[in-house]
């Protein structure tokens, strides 16, 4: 029965689905552009009817182009690859304004009734935050031949513009750094040159705030986003994990523990390095406190996103903000305490802490939506011995303090890359882990047992940015994203050189002040969990 539902790729008379057959999403305002589309060029896909048509394709960084003559497809020849539900109406839209339902979309009810079938608002928000996480990869200098390896290639003031993401309406408020002087050697990137920008530091992501008034109105609030860099393809960092739980020490309960490598990455600092003089934790607490004070009185949300190891840091930092009560604000006029909601969009993330950590996140109201591919191995570690799927996990932790017990936090959105007709079969584990592939799967997911069908018209060429996951008949070369001439420019002597960067954004001068303010919040009125600045 199941086999009859599958499309046969070996049949030469069959063709792949045309992008023009995919239904257009409905909008309340048809003149308003789709704000979640990173590349606004319309993607065209290659029919499989004649292999000679490949030569007519020109691949660029933004789209795959096909001549107008090729757009005349015979609809009778176009079939969907996977057919699970013939009654699926992919044109169904949530007609409520996002500004009215944003708390629900951000997980106030743990996404109940929004994932199956997939809510149209939620789909676009997952994609939007996935792209904000992907920006960490697209802007990171991976080149070991550059003395700037390990930095962000763009200054904060031009970050979103350089990445063609200015339409999202965010502005970076600070960059995040971490010391590489910890036991995760396969995660950090270092230059092979002797003279480098920093011996210890690696750029880890950014904090940004929504400043565009139209977007604030559309979303219904001012959004503060924290995006963490992970690992775009290489999975060697997994082998660096010691599978040792370390007390979080962000609150009063020593039984709340997180994986030791993640803890070190988040809390360690290097006094001799300008970029690592504050730990990643201190940078986060300081900046979130500063922004919340600055925008006091407004409707605000805090959204944290990350992929792979970055997803682990996203959950840890969200928990930390809530545990330290930095998101609890007192209204200046009424004196009423309000709590800013915290949401995490995690992509392909590992387990972070023990069951007590998971339970404490739930108590604090930290909402986590974990987007995973069932074929990806990263979400299965650490915690192979004892995890949330075990019936007796709580007994192991409470009775014998079992040291290798881990539990996932939040709600899981389970995807399967074999359901996409655009992706090829592969045994390469990095493909199943790829962030762009996850975003692609979200675009076509409609619920369990429903056929895969793209909705937002997001360019499928983006999948092959850093891998070779698309089927070859779509004419998109692998690993196509790179800077022009790999960043080399001609100097005044006519020689090709790596251009100097005048400024590498470091820590704002008021970091220590706002950090101390954040720590004071945790100790005021008996709210608990605070630390003096010198002890953090």
What are these regions (language model features)?
Residues 2-125, 222, 258, 264, ...:
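Serine hydrolase/lipase
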Residues 112, 116-118, 123, 143, ...:
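General structural concept
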Residues 130, 140, 147-158, 388, ...:
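Terminal and linker regions of secretory-pathway proteins
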Residues 311:
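Catalytic nucleophile loop
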């Amino acid at each position: 029965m199941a086999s009859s539902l599958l499309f046969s790729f070996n049949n030469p008379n069959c063709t792949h689905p045309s992008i023009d057959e995919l239904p257009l999403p409905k909008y309340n305002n048809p003149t308003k552009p789709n704000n979640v589309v990173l590349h606004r060029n319309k993607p065209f896909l290659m029919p499989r009817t004649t292999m000679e048509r490949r030569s007519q394709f020109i691949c660029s960084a933004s789209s795959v182009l096909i001549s107008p003559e090729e757009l005349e497809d015979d609809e009778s020849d176009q079939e969907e690859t996977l057919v699970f539900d013939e009654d699926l109406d992919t044109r169904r839209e949530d007609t409520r304004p996002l500004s009215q339902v944003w708390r629900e979309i951000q997980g106030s009810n743990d996404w109940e009734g929004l994932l199956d079938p997939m809510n149209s608002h939620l789909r676009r928000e997952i994609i939007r935050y996935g792209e904000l996480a992907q920006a960490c990869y697209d802007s990171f200098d991976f080149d070991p031949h550059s003395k700037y390896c390990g930095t962000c290639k763009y200054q904060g003031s031009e970050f979103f513009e350089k990445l063609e993401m200015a339409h999202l309406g965010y502005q970076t408020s600070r960059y995040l750094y971490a010391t590489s002087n910890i036991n995760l050697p396969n995660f950090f990137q270092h230059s092979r040159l002797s003279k480098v920008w920093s011996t210890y530091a690696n750029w880890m992501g950014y904090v940004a705030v929504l400043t565009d008034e139209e977007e604030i109105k559309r979303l219904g609030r001012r959004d503060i986003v924290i995006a963490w860099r992970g690992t775009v393809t290489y999975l060697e960092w997994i082998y660096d994990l010691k599978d040792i739980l370390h007390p979080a020490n962000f609150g009063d309960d020593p039984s709340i523990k997180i994986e030791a490598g993640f803890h070190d990455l988040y809390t360690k600092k290097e006094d001799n390095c300008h970029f690592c003089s504050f730990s990643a934790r201190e940078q986060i607490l300081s900046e979130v406190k500063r922004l919340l004070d600055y925008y006091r009185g407004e409707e605000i949300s805090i959204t944290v996103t990350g992929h792979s190891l970055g997803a682990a840091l996203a959950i840890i930092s969200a928990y930390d903000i809530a545990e330290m009560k930095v998101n609890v604000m007192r209204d200046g006029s009424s004196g009423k305490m309000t709590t800013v909601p915290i949401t995490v969009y995690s992509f392909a993330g590992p387990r972070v802490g023990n069951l007590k950590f998971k339970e404490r996140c739930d108590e604090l109201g930290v909402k986590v939506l974990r987007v995973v591919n069932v074929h990806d191995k990263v979400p299965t570690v650490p915690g192979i011995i004892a995890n949330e799927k075990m019936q007796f996990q709580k007994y192991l932790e409470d009775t014998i303090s079992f040291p290798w017990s881990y539990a996932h936090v939040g709600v899981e959105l389970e995807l399967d890359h074999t359901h996409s007709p655009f992706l090829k079969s592969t045994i390469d584990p990095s493909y199943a882990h790829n962030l762009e592939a996850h975003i692609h799967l979200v675009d076509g997911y409609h619920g369990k047992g429903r056929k895969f069908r793209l909705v937002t018209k997001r360019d499928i060429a983006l999948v092959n940015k850093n891998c070779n996951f698309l089927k070859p008949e779509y004419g998109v070369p692998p690993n196509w994203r790179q800077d022009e001439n790999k960043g080399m420019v001609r100097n005044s002597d006519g020689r090709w050189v790596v251009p100097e960067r005048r400024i590498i954004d470091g820590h704002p001068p008021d970091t220590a002040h706002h950090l101390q303010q954040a720590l004071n919040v945790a100790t005021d009125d008996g709210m608990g969990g605070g630390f003096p600045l010198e002890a953090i």
